[in-house]
């Protein structure tokens, strides 16, 4: 009898030890998924190489670029889900609320060419497009860059032609042999994509195409960026332009950050409200914009997340115009710098020196 009690006591003791060991290991794993008190001193020099259709996003700690986690994959603060695909990190199964599984936000399904897609699901109707179902709405982006990069303005009668053996078409200049562009004037129009609705409105059959905004034309001071989109009732590819300012030219490059050991200051917010200016126009309202900082180790910082607002400008007495303006959310620092990055830093330093003199 005493032997049985002794054996039972040892088993209970072993179970308690295993339980404490398991809790300790879980605590260590959870700790690796939390945001550190401060970002690591160095992120990878090059952006991560993600699978086709997967975006590179800032981790949940806003430190480094990572590949967005997809549906069914594990997620955490350091490995965020692809929110643009309607995904969120479901942490209900983790008592510590540190890790989870990327799950689609409940939404309506989509129907495309007779096929039903769930909200958050990605698909390719052809080799030219990557589409995503978002709560009953289908959004598509082109896989062919030439499909949205329009020819130069001096290109007479531009038209697209198919290339044998290739998926993507290409632009050529010159009059059409049949003297009719036909459907080529609507580069994004696809009569077969009816989504099961028989109507004459061309916008219903339009696969949305919108490029990313180009880099700002100036490294400092007010410049402009462009994109091409067919988000209009005619489904026509139109060029859009917005004002942008990555940083003011009087920013000091020799002091990129106030934190000891840091070589870059990614994002810096203006301490005082300022009027935006371009040419002879001044904004009616003041703003406290965010700017991208500079690095002391040769890297350059560029906008990562941006949005566009409509700002009112007064260009002459009584003349008020509205202009789209880029607003910076976050910036990222990397080594993929423009060729004139060194000259840009020298220009900043020269202007700063003159200002001090």
Curated annotation (Swiss-Prot):
GO terms for cellular component: cytoplasm; cytosol; extracellular matrix; extracellular region; extracellular space; gap junction; intracellular membrane-bounded organelle. It comes from the Eukaryota. Residues 264-338 form the CTCK domain. Induction: Expression is down-regulated by WT1. Expression is down-regulated by pro-inflammatory stimuli such as TNF or IL1B. Expression is induced by laminar shear stress and statins. InterPro entries: CCN, Cys_knot_C, Glyco_hormone_CN, Growth_fac_rcpt_cys_sf, IGFBP-like, IGFBP_CNN, Insulin_GF-bd_Cys-rich_CS, TSP1_CCN. A lipid is attached at residue 244 (S-palmitoyl cysteine). GO terms for biological process: angiogenesis; bone regeneration; cell adhesion; cell adhesion mediated by integrin; cell chemotaxis; chondrocyte differentiation; endothelial cell chemotaxis; endothelial cell-cell adhesion. May be palmitoylated on Cys-244, which is important for extracellular secretion. Disulfide bonds join 35-61, 39-63, 43-64, 50-67, 75-89, 81-102, 264-301, 281-315, 292-331, 295-333, 300-337. Keywords: Cell junction, Cytoplasm, Disulfide bond, Gap junction, Glycoprotein, Growth factor, Hormone, Lipoprotein, Palmitate, Secreted, Signal. Glycans are attached at residues 97, 280. PROSITE patterns: CTCK_1, CTCK_2, IGFBP_N_1, IGFBP_N_2, TSP1, VWFC_1, VWFC_2. Its main location: secreted. GO terms for molecular function: growth factor activity; heparin binding; hormone activity; integrin binding; Notch binding. Residues 108-174 form the VWFC domain. Belongs to the CCN family. This is CCN family member 3. It comes from Homo sapiens. The lineage of its organism: Eukaryota, Metazoa, Chordata, Craniata, Vertebrata. The gene is CCN3.
